Amino acid sequence: MHKLILFSLLFSFLGSPLIAQEAVLTPEFHKSKREALRAEMPANSVAVLFSNPVRNRANDVDYVYHPDPNFYYLTGFKEPQSVLVVYKNPQQDDLGQYVDQLFVQERDPAKEQWNGYRLGVEGAEALGVDRVLLRSEFIKSQTNFTSFEEVLIFEFKNDVRDDKNDPNDLYDLQRTFKENINYPQDFNRLRHRLLKSIRTVGKEDVETLKNEINWYAGRNESIAEDPAIKNFLESSTLEVPEDLKMQVAFLLKDQYFDVELLGQLLGDQREVKTVEEIALLKKAIGISVVGQREVMKAMRPDMSEREIQGIHEFVFKKYGAAYEGYPSIVGAGSNACVLHYIENDDVGMDSDLMLMDLGAEYEGYTADITRTIPKDGTFSEEQKLIYQIVYDAQEAGIEAAVVGSTSGQITRITQEVVAKGLVRLGIIAKEDEFRTYYPHGAAHHIGLDVHDLSNYGPFKANAIITVEPGIYIPKNSPCDPKWWGIGIRIEDDVLITEKGPINISANAPRTWEAIEELMKESSPLDQFLLPELGN
């Protein structure tokens, strides 16, 4: 009976009003996204998108499949081994006109018994794409993509395996398409973009382009040593020499594709959320907020990073979030000073801070929230001082999260607060030294990706961004040792509106006083005692 009561408590304590109402994306939603893309595509162009590959974990075990966010955004389809084609202009077949095609896996009862059901052509037709065909038809059709003015694609991933027993797998779908559009085997996206810029640059922009290329060349040996790029950098005229134009034109000859524009067009769409998307993100954020709150109540000094991670992820799954939006970051003490620390295998000291950067992924949309709390329930004086600087920086950043502002502006505002605070505490001597302890940006979009696709221009209404300043002082830093081992980040998810910013994740305590107060509350997990493991 005791166990039944305990598990009842564990499952009932999560009945929280912080969770947003249910939302769902319909075929009409995805169709509207394809139509919006078509409207912005160049004349006589075509966009071709491939599903994500199935990635191998080890031996005969694969990772859980995650659909490509852009592919899902445009189709609602979650299966691998598939292709989407979107045409700017209507195409014609025996059934009439169509503007998009979806190529999918065939049904296979034997494989479905082992690995799960497939929609097949008939099931996928419910998604509302004009033509749904078997993936083998993509190879057989031999569509002449070079007949289009522009073929819009994303750069191909290099981790696609070839299943020798499947002549129509993703590897073969991509191989056939690459041959069709003359996609180089050694394609370098940056080199391709720079060569196209050299080919089209006007004389008034030559020096600007040279400065840009020199910046890349100083960081990328393949760019620095490219013969055509070297010739451009070494030319002394304000115009691109004719022989160099011919050299670049030859290098780009018969390459019928563009790897930049599709991302830009979808970035414009995805950075502005619809009502349905905002509802899904509010749900993911609400779930993540409950995780942060329950951990604050359950935290005990002897808990390991992995135990804390487990509580968060239990909450996620309890509310129907199948996955985390990214590997959970749970770092105690100096581990918090590693920005993407994911080992999560330490216990730390009782007096350590615990930085917890986690986000539930709900129906594909991911939250991204960070809180930093004291393992023993009480901030030390040094920890309070650093925490207050980060909090003040975040307050300034959230206030600046308005229509027309940018991620860069928010970052600079938070940097100014952090720099002044670190000088005031004597941790740095000059404000321009702040990057030693605050090395990252302060804002990014969230959505189907934790760092969501965006062109990162001025914010528009209904964008959802993070605001996440931090200070990280690892051991042996050039400052008083009393600061060593303090790593603090506060991150919230903020909706941009015409009336100002709305902090969707505000119900997870942010001030050090509110955190200490919540940590005094009891947790249902206090009585969750597991038996000792036997031999």
What is each PLM-predicted segment?
Residues 21-535:
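Active-site neighborhoods and metal-handling regions in enzymes and metal-associated proteins
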Residues 1-6:
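Positively charged n-region of N-terminal signal peptides that target proteins for export
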Residues 7-16:
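Bacterial N-terminal signal peptides
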